[in-house]
């Protein structure tokens, strides 16, 4: 009779929506149980109602906090089938252990912790390892030599003095961007390989580095080692952090930082030049470039020393040709200028004006030509007007030599020796009147 009732209860199933219940409060979403059996529900598959074979349920103690859970795709809707025999109250539903939840509906750990990678092979934590879950950031501090690969942890950065920068420990950030980075950083650089190069923890003395000397890291104080190059192997080059945007801010992981003084801040570019090995040709070119300003400055100093009042040359050079006449202070640069000047002091005036009645003589021909232009070529003056010397006149002819009419026009065919008819002897002053 009981088996017959159990078959009837197996056939009568009711679908109940569980929207208001959370994943911890809702019983198994793809399982059905019989209230006629033991208090512990026996899960059976919906697709095989009569079958008593059920998958093994994992114990609640098997799930460890912090372990990723397996995600399975399932098309089962968020509905549960319950038998109506023992569901008169909500006690059976609320007292249902959470361990009966199917693995298909358990939320994967990456959905709760987006910081973890999808590659779960790197995140399996041994059970015998001590776990520190007191802090909300759930850091897992394990010794680095136990793992070959490092998983990214965005929530915690170890505060240890022997750690290298993230660019050296993270393979994703150690890809060569410039050609210089490939020579200094090997492709197989990892934290496990670099820990052997670091000196012992006892030899590390914390030192404070100002922002002017080293590029600031995202978090944590920077404590570079104070040991010398002898702590490192001879065939291993010293690793240096280098950023193209701030070339003068570089720090060596194997050399002491030294004291921070204003002089050291002023000489930041010199430290940058010492980080790279300079070729002999480039070093010689740099030395010559630094020497050239000193040579220029020495030349400028010599010129400034020569610019004293005693060493200044005379602005007007002392002329060589002087007039020898007493009382004359004439000075000339050329010999011909002096000869022309000497004619003015002599009594000889060979250049005489040809205008009738003028007879003015000059010692130089240029003075006579100036006399023609200024005296006889203009009307209304005291001197006689000559039309042949006026450039604006129709009778302009500077080479004409002969007799002139009373108004100054030329008489062609006449000569200077000839006398004017019916004119008598008239003076120049009479012509002017």
UniProtKB/Swiss-Prot annotation:
Keyword annotations for this protein? Activator, Conidiation, DNA-binding, Metal-binding, Nucleus, Repeat, Sporulation, Transcription, Transcription regulation, Zinc, Zinc-finger
Q: Which GO terms describe its biological process?
A: conidium formation; sporulation resulting in formation of a cellular spore
- Zinc is among the record's keywords: yes
Q: Which Gene3D superfamilies match?
A: Classic Zinc Finger (3.30.160.60)
Give the boundaries of each C2H2-type zinc finger: 321-345, 351-376
Give the Polar residues compositional bias ranges.
240-264
Check the record and name the InterPro entries matching this protein: Znf_C2H2_sf, Znf_C2H2_type
- UniProt GO cellular component terms: chromatin; nucleus; transcription regulator complex
Q: Which GO terms describe its molecular function?
A: DNA-binding transcription factor activity, RNA polymerase II-specific; RNA polymerase II cis-regulatory region sequence-specific DNA binding; zinc ion binding
Subcellular location(s) of the protein: Nucleus
Task: Report if keyword Nucleus is assigned.
Answer: yes
Q: Where is this region: Disordered?
A: 23-64, 240-265, 391-416
**Parts forming coiled coils:** none
Induction or repression: Expression is regulated by the heterotrimeric G protein pga1. Expression is also positively regulated by stuA.
| UniProt feature, compositional bias: Low complexity | 30-48
* Source species, domain of life: Eukaryota
Explain the purpose of this protein: BrlA, abaA and wetA are pivotal regulators of conidiophore development and conidium maturation. They act individually and together to regulate their own expression and that of numerous other sporulation-specific genes. Binds promoters of target genes at brlA response elements (BREs) containing the conserved sequence 5'-(C/A)(A/G)AGGG(G/A)-3'. Is not required for penicillin V production.
Q: Which PANTHER family does the entry link to?
A: TRANSCRIPTIONAL REPRESSOR PROTEIN YY, YY2 TRANSCRIPTION FACTOR
Tell me the protein's name.
C2H2 type master regulator of conidiophore development brlA
* Native species: Penicillium rubens (strain ATCC 28089 / DSM 1075 / NRRL 1951 / Wisconsin 54-1255)
Taxonomy-wise, where does this protein's organism fall, top ranks first?
Answer: Eukaryota, Fungi, Dikarya, Ascomycota, Pezizomycotina
Primary gene name: brlA
